[in-house]
Amino acid sequence: MNKLNLAFEAICLISGSAYGQDHSQHSHHDHNNHTTLSAEKVSQDDSIYHLDGKWQSHTGETLTLADLQGQPVVISMIYGSCTTACPVLVNDARRVFEALPERYQSHVKLVMVSFDEDRDTPVSLAQYADKYGLGDDVWTFLHGDDNTIRALATLLGVRYRKRSDGDFDHSNLVTVLDTRGRIVQRIEGLNRPVEDAVAALIKVIDDNHLLHH
């Protein structure tokens, strides 16, 4: 693990400790008066790949969510200037990935979607990825417009609202999608156990015989 990754994990540990081990319901504990919003219930029959909005990735690519189909995805919604929950959410997604047996890892994509249409441009997201050593092919950071972001959040069950200071209150949620973009597992809260998410990913990969492709 390189120094950037170690630095990122240190930030996550500090943020997670300050923020608390599990604020999956409601919280008013950080210095920005951030409120954690509980996630909505969702249907596991709906695919996010039916959404036709356009996104820009941190590498400058324009894509739709359907371009991700064919492999399981670990997805979370964050914003780049968040210094409390969001770094922990990113690290939680990485914890899921790193807990997979190595032969499964190349069949999984990690996708971070920003709430912050104004500040999290593709360039800003690329800088975020570079800063924390998240620039390899497994990671995709996405920027979209307000309607596109809202539609995705609704299907994922992520609640968020923009505050007067430009920051966001939001749900802390890491979601596992199957190859067709349907929800198969969710982790709500911060620094939560990842075993169920890992098992869900392995099942998707095995059921679709992806190891043999």
Named regions from a protein language model:
Residues R163-H213:
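Thiol-/selenol-based redox modules, centered on thioredoxin-like
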Residues V90-L152:
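Structural microenvironment flanking redox-active thiols in thiol-disulfide oxidoreductases
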Residues S15-S17:
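N-terminal signal peptide c-region/cleavage motif recognized by signal peptidases
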Residues Q21-L37, H213:
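Histidine-centered metal-binding segments
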Residues H50-L51, V73, S171-L173:
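Short loop/turn microsegments at loop-to-beta-strand junctions
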Residues L65-A93:
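Short active-site neighborhood of thiol/selenol oxidoreductases, capturing the structured segment around
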Residues N32-A66, N91:
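N-terminal "domain-start" segment that seeds a small globular fold
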Residues M1-A7:
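Bacterial N-terminal signal peptides that target proteins for export
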